[in-house]
Amino acid sequence: MILKHPQFQAYSSIHIAGIEGKPFDIEIQNGRFTSVKEAEPRHVQAEQPQQKLWISPGIIDLHTHLAWTDFDHADQLNRDSREVEVMQAEAFAATLRTGVTTARDAGGILPSTIRHLVKYYQQPLRVQTSSEMLGAADAKGVKHLEGRLAEIYATGAGWIKIMATGGLGAPTEKVTEPNFSEEEFAFIVRHAHANRKKVLVHTWGGVTIDWSIQAGVESIEHGMFLTWDQAGRLAESGVAFVPTTSIYRIAADPKGVLALSPVICERAARAADAHATAIGYAKRAGIRLGFGTDYATPSLHGYNLQEFDTLLDYGLNRAEAWKSATQDAAEILGSGHELGRIAEGYVADAVIYAADPYQAQNADQLRKSIISVVTGADEAGLI
């Protein structure tokens, strides 16, 4: 159940995820938390037992692709526009149902499309977007890049996405080679920041991580070939790291939902193996980590919580993993003053559970424990 922009909602003796042994009385008015206080002891009659509930902030997915309907974009081009629109609306609905109340789309969807989907399909998912991505085809000098950036700004996007290296489509031995010159890369970041846009950088590793640190981008994505030296400098710079770990483990499975070719599966497996080391470096160095899935197909939307499983497998504790999906994710978006916490004055984006989410054994158990999702905004507040 999605509870949209509640005018008034009260929860008595509810437990906040991550705070043990202290139930809280929580009130929401006009879509914001107005009271969060430790509950006074109550006498509950034996014949009227109270259901024990937990609440967490709404989950923030910092790297998703809500407009994409197929792993191979050529397949999406074969679909008619009405079919694509319905599938995009279903992606919004599935994402909300799994407890994700805010998403940063990492390329592919326009702000105008978001407004349309929110309004006509009644799905109050808060989305920040980067519209179109800048990739190898745009490495034609700063004059060309200036024009491309102007086009992206005109869409209303708040983020600029730089495809700084290859990905699963590139041979492993070449995947960290830069798509842009250092001059072009620095120009993009400088121009974006001058126009009050934030920058996220797709990079598997290599020199483009160094460039990202030097330029002061907001976040790097994937980063599985991050070195220990780079991790230290990344932490010092304040640049965030959104590793998107689960998608590579999914892609590596030849019998999985993506059913990719053996060559792609092998590349994904190498990436997944490297990610465990990169997460270890990031944790030791104190890098701000952000939760992101890189999910882009109907078989994956709605299963965003799988990212918790891989983050835990790769060495984060539960508090660190949850912080990456709430408080730290909100800070990365520039919304740490109003999202990512159960606190008075904050937007009431939240998830209600029938069991302690910190004790869930896996993403499937966590997802099944969700009773309702609360969105502080309704559709009108997001368009």
Kindly give the residue locations of the regions a language model identified.
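N-terminal metal-binding scaffold of metallo-dependent hydrolase/deaminase domains
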Residues: 1-43, 53-55, 351, 357-360
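Metal-associated gating/positioning segment near the N- to mid-region
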Residues: 53-119, 183, 215
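Divalent metal-dependent hydrolysis catalytic cores, especially in the metallo-beta-lactamase
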Residues: 87-113, 124-135, 156-170, 198, ...
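Active-site gating loops and adjacent loop-to-helix segments of metal-dependent hydrolytic enzymes
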Residues: 65-96, 124, 128-131, 166-182, ...
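Histidine/acidic-residue-rich catalytic or RNA/ligand-binding cores of hydrolases
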Residues: 70-73, 115, 209-215, 247-260, ...
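Histidine/acidic residue-rich metal-binding segments in metalloenzymes
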Residues: 144-164, 169-241, 257-258, 268-289, ...
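His/Asp/Glu-enriched, well-ordered alpha-helical/loop segment
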Residues: 194, 272-357
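C-terminal cap of metal-dependent C-N hydrolases
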Residues: 16, 325-327, 331, 344-383
